[in-house]
A protein has these predicted regions:
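N-terminal anchoring/stem segment of glycosyltransferases
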Residues: 1-78, 99-102, 255, 281-286, ...
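A conditional alpha-helix N-cap/helix-loop micro-motif detector
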Residues: 15-16, 84-87, 214
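Charged, glycine/proline-rich intrinsically disordered loops and linkers
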Residues: 56-81, 142-170
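Short, polar loop motifs at secondary-structure junctions
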Residues: 37-44, 116-118, 237-239
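Short amphipathic alpha-helical segments and helix-helix/interface helices
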Residues: 20-27, 94-95, 119-123, 221-222
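A glycosyltransferase accessory/donor-loop signature
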Residues: 1-5, 9, 18, 163-180, ...
């Protein structure tokens, strides 16, 4: 018997301690089932009400470093083809969960720490929608190195331009940029998920993900949204924690609109829209964050 709704996360073995803390944080505030997909590993996540599923997938070999270390935290190398081949499992995992475990799913990035509002994410789901509802991006236009930007009516320098050219998509219709770290999806979105993965798997993109998909599966999701002229989604519901702190966020407060406080850090419009703190990968630091959030209840 399927659940009405569930959370889904995924990881490889090296990343599993981070994802386990993410699942633990959700469980502090939610009794909704959690499914963790573990890529090419039998390791199990030890959190109550959480089921671990082995997910076998092909990982394209790439000898370049997968991660870069920054203090006690680390970040993925978006140039790395192995990382790309793991990230594009996201739509397939969401599809699998919808087909086998639940009528609706909420995908959550594994380097997230939930707040008491986490379950509100399911309130944004339209069960009749034929596409996932992705979270609003922190910025409307992204840059990477010397690439990116839209100048006047010239879209040819945008990060998404090569993929738009590849798939024949007119990006001038674009409105809000969407991020793929948080989304909700129902059964009627399975066709979208399949097309998303098919586009991500294009041989030219696999061979040169840096050119065509600089933000990996997220770049391609936006191209597909523009192709279908889909503009709705989740509001901005998280805070990047790397350059701020939980105490600072609550000290600044909520202004009724998305509030950019520094580069790559914004606070959602309302406190009830703050569902997750994002970006901390050190399990010890994540545990401290969980305890601080519990104390603030």
């Amino acid at each position: 018997m399927k659940h009405e709704k569930c959370y889904i996360l995924y990881s490889d073995e090296a990343y599993s301690p981070t994802v386990e803390k993410c699942a633990k944080s959700i469980r502090q505030f939610s009794d909704i089932p959690i499914y963790v997909y573990m890529m090419n590993s039998d390791i199990s996540i030890d959190v109550e009400g959480t089921k671990t599923i082995r997910w076998d997938c092909e990982v394209v070999p790439d000898e370049s470093p997968r991660y870069s270390q920054h203090g006690t935290n680390f970040y993925i190398n978006r140039y790395n083809k192995s990382i790309y081949s793991m990230l594009i499992q996201r739509p397939l995992i969401a599809k699998h969960a919808l087909e086998n475990y639940s009528e609706s799913v909420a995908y959550v990035d594994g380097d997230s720490v939930a707040t008491k509002n986490a379950d509100r994410i399911f309130g944004y789901l339209d069960p009749d929608s034929d596409h996932p509802a992705f979270v609003e991006g922190i910025y409307e236009v992204l840059f990477m190195g010397d690439r990116g930007g839209i100048y006047g009516g010239d879209y040819t320098r945008s990060l998404e331009h090569p993929a738009c050219e590849l798939f024949g998509v007119d990006q001038s219709v674009r409105k809000k940029y969407r991020q793929t770290g948080y989304f909700v999806a129902g059964h009627k979105s399975i066709g979208f998920l399949e097309e998303w993965h098919d586009m991500c798997s294009h041989p030219l993109i696999i061979d040169n993900c840096w050119l065509y998909a600089p933000f990996n599966e997220e770049t391609i999701a936006n191209v597909l949204l523009w192709k279908k002229k889909i503009f709705d989604g989740l509001p901005y519901v998280y805070v990047n924690i790397g350059a701020t702190s939980i105490s600072e966020v609550y000290s600044i407060g909520f202004s009724g609109q998305k509030n950019h406080i520094r580069e790559w850090v914004a606070i959602p419009a309302e406190e009830e829209e703050l569902l997750f703190f994002h970006g901390e990968k050190n399990p010890g630091n994540m545990q401290s964050m969980i305890e601080e959030i519990i104390e603030r209840q």
